[in-house]
Amino acid sequence: MKTQLAFLAITVILMQLFAQTEAGFWGKLWEGVKNAIGKRGLRNVDQIADLFDSGLSDADDLFDSGLSDADAKFMKMFM
């Protein structure tokens, strides 16, 4: 009985340590996904895709697809 109680206590402690470690990892991973897929992240991906899209249709000419100076500086940081 004492062995079972000690085994249970050790198991609970190890599970708590594992859960806290996993929570930190999954939390950081989820935050990165939210930043990449969030409104601003998707908008930036769309603007970058427009830069490399050579076959624009007439409908695309109706919308402003140019980059602002701030966007150009932001992209230069990564190059």
UniProtKB/Swiss-Prot annotation:
Signal peptide residues on this chain, from the entry's feature table: 1-23
Principal localisation: secreted
Domain of life: Eukaryota
Propeptide: 41-79
GO biological process, one term: defense response to bacterium
Localization of this protein: Secreted; Target cell membrane
Tissue expression remark: Expressed by the venom gland.
GO cellular component entries: extracellular region; membrane; other organism cell membrane
Isoleucine amide modified-residue sites: I37
Keywords linked to the UniProt accession: Amidation, Antibiotic, Antimicrobial, Cleavage on pair of basic residues, Cytolysis, Hemolysis, Membrane, Secreted, Signal, Target cell membrane, Target membrane, Transmembrane
Family to which the UniProt record says this protein belongs: Belongs to the non-disulfide-bridged peptide (NDBP) superfamily. Short antimicrobial peptide (group 4) family.
Protein name: Antimicrobial peptide UyCT1
Organism: Urodacus yaschenkoi
